[in-house]
Amino acid sequence: MTLFTTYHEAIEWIHSRLAFGVKPGLERMKWLMDRLDHPEQKIKAVHVAGTNGKGSTIAFTRSILQSAGYSVGTFTSPFILTFNERISVNGEPILDEEWLSLVNEIKPLVDELDDTELGAATEFEIITACAFAYFAHVHQVDFVLLETGLGGRLDSTNVAAPILTAITSIGHDHMAILGDTLDQIAAEKAGIIKAGIPMITAVHQAEALTVIQHKAEEKNAPFISLHDTCTFKDQQPTETGERFTFTTPKREYSQLETGLIGTHQMQNASLAVLLIEWLEQEGYIHVLNEQVYEGIRQAVWAGRFEKVQDQPLVYLDGAHNEEGMERLIETVQAHFSSKQVHVCFSALKDKPYKQMIEKLERISSSIHFVSFDFPRAESAEKLYVCSHLEAKTFDEDPRAVLDFIQKKRDDPSAMILVTGSLYFISDVRSLILQ
């Protein structure tokens, strides 16, 4: 049996499984978990689904737990800086040699699974299985914050036995798999709800909220709606984030300050606070008020309205659907109304990029379209044709973003906004920081 001798071989093998595409369903994961001695049942997991806001909510929750002295594992996707960050402990990606060891443990099982009627394991299934094995058998932590990859009901992560579940938001994304309407999409996300396990949600649309609440009632799971039970006031942007007062049924958090910029980050931070309150109520943790404040203030999450350069001002944001783009535009208008906004945009072929471009044109002085090295990336020219803005250019080479930024170097009124895809901003981030 051939095992890998280097990290790069191991990761190349994982990426080669992209050829098997996305195959919703839990049968292969259950098969793998059974043969790995059920690591998914040996961790204290908080399971987070949602169209947008999953990563930021996890970042806030992790930061609060760490401030209170707990060790926290996270499983998130996609990666922004390095592949390793998908499995992290206290914000630190696991080591190359740990990945190599995990892959060598799981590869013989995957080879065996390939020959069964269940069929070949996908890239995401293998990465998810590695995460469960790592947190159960290699590096035990107090809590694991588990982000769904796509949907919820049939997502690979849904073999977990969580102590708490959350849905951040419902919007239009992955509709070919999850359904066209908000209630259909909500039903898929609500598939993470487990019998008797609390579900906390920041979803606000009535039709989606009703579906989630009904599923919780079916499962006899305590149900908490952030927007029905909590209030926001005194909201104002700061230089590095947002300041607001948030009141839950338990207490008031006056003048909370986020370390992440964006009006939507108030909701993500507040959902994290509710998760913390419930973990405390259930007896899992003890957290002081000042640790909540510190955690919210210190949370960081790459690629979410992230400043990567000062001259000219360059921000990266992973907005990749209509709702995400609306939130991004609100953020730019709240924080940078005096700036000339120049957008660098790219997107995947299966995203609603025409609608995203249309929204961006409301705040853009110019748009520069590029493509990037990814199987589903749309061509820059096709994106360019969709725009009605006069000041527009395109280049198929992602490195053209650097020239675009360079040209604005001496313009103090300019702000460069790189957006449209998490995969795209990951590439651009590497280019800029090199």
Describe these PLM feature segments.
Residues 42, 138, 143-148, 154-166, ...:
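Nucleotide phosphate-binding/pyrophosphate-handling subdomain across enzymes
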Residues 205-215, 220-224, 313-316, 322, ...:
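C-terminal helical cap/extension that packs against the catalytic core
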Residues 1-50, 57-59, 63-70, 75, ...:
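Short functional linear segments
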Residues 33, 38-41, 67-160:
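ATP-dependent carboxylate-amine ligase catalytic core
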Residues 421:
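Active-site-proximal loop/hinge segments that shape catalytic or ion-binding/gating pockets
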Residues 149-153, 160-220:
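Conserved catalytic-core segment of NTP-binding enzymes
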Residues 202-203, 215-237, 258-263, 291-298, ...:
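Beta-strand->loop->alpha-helix junctions that form or flank phosphate-binding loops
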Residues 61, 153-163, 429-433:
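Short Gly/Thr/Asp-enriched flexible loops that form oxyanion-binding sites at enzyme active sites
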